[in-house]
Amino acid sequence: MNAVGIDVSKGKSMVAIMRPFGEIVSAPFEIKHTASDIHSLVELINSVEGESRIVMEHTGRYYEVLAHQLSKANLFVSAINPKLIKDFDNDSLRKVKSDKADSVKIARYALDKWQNLKQYNVMDELRNQLKTMNRQFCFYMKCKTAMKNNLIGILDQTYPGVNTYFDSPARSDGSQKWVDFASTYWHVDCVRKMSLNAFIDHYQNWCKRKKYNFSQSKAEEIYGKAKELVPVLPKDAITKLIIKQAVDQLNSASTTVESLRTLMNETASKLPEYPIVMAMKGVGASLGPQLMAEIGDVSRFTHKGAITDFAGVDPGVNESGSYEQKSVPTSKRGSSDLRKTLFQVMDVLIKTHPQDDPVYQFIDKKRAQGKPYYVYMTAGANKFLRIYYGRVKEYLSSLPES
């Protein structure tokens, strides 16, 4: 048995090959993440007598090139959580941190955990694209939130409270009524310098041009509030430029978010489990693809507990002797993006309260018992994942083999 420990970094890796009882087959050496170096590594591993297993840490995206290419070469590859490697065999007072030492430590981990190593599965291209899109979607959502807060902060100095005038959702192109309104009426003087009738006519024409619903009572309300507001920044070309730039940045982020949302739904619709997932309560055209992106192929989970462990919503245990803690926090060692999506699904269930849904019934029961918010939300996410696992796995098993 040969343990190949690979300490992965960006563009290069350190490799060490060991056998039981500390026998060094190959001292740590460096390889580049190029086709020639990876091919040479495959030939070296195949030339070593006996079964070989490769272990590396799944850090960021760095490891994926090696893991993918070595798996395609029919080698046993296992990608391990970096925390497990870090906590392994810390029985020395001396702290040594180098790529060579890390590769040897990973090889020793492979020997110690030989029987428990799980083989790395190459994700198919469609799921990989969907997951990448979801990560981009989350990134641009954060950008959109930052741009929105930035615009509101500027408008508070020219037209305080204008962002609260309309609550209509974003359109398919990402545009929002309050943003478009603030782009046109960027300063309170843009409204109150006109007469009431003139503003109503102007606002009505604006609604018609932008294809928004017009309400005369709303126009009168806006005009009345404008009379009482006190701006800080003057109504001049510099202030207008600042606001226009902030609006353009927000609209750009919003457009990207909505285009990604649409593309993710189109991509997810090609997955076999799409109809089952989309039929679940609390899941729609936005959250459904996000769930499928983060969970991936359900068949890789051996049981229901494995999928809740993966999400980090599994209940913790703290027992010692006669002591048994009643309420233990969840591990939160899994995918934070998946937990966020699950909480959004739970939030939809609470707002829509479908009485025939078992997850909502469970959440409602926990709320009635007086459980704290995070307790019943996490418990609901756990139950939702178990149902998700059961329904999807049953459906996939019923499909004819391709």
Task: Name what the model sees in each region.
Residues 1-402:
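A detector of single, family-specific signature residues
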